[in-house]
């Protein structure tokens, strides 16, 4: 499940699902560091959306760690593996809210 907001190194990023990201920005996701926003293409499958979220989250982690020049290939590779590790092992942290 993708949260509405996420903190990276104490900085809050709002997560927004946007129509036609691919057509507007030629990306499936996008992080706006100065605005504190992660945008995801609303029309993606849930698995792909989660994978793209992890990808953008890693960009945020690198940026907040002071690494402004990021190798997109490394982010892609690590995000795919990290997403699969989290999913396959059903890993989550913090309190699970039940309704």
Where are these regions (language model features)?
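Active-site recognition of the HExxH zinc-binding catalytic motif
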Residues: 51-63
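Metalloprotease/metallohydrolase-associated module, dominated by Zn2+-dependent proteases
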Residues: 1-48, 64-99
């Amino acid at each position: 499940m993708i949260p509405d907001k996420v903190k990276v190194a104490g900085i809050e990023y709002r997560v927004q699902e946007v129509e036609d990201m691919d057509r507007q920005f030629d990306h499936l996701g996008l992080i706006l560091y100065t605005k504190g926003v992660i945008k995801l293409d609303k029309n993606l499958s849930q698995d792909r959306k989660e994978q793209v979220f992890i990808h953008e989250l890693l960009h945020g982690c690198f940026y907040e760690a002071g690494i402004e020049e990021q190798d997109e290939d490394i982010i892609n590779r690590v995000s795919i593996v990290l997403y699969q590790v989290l999913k396959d092992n059903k890993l989550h942290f913090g309190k699970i809210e039940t309704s």
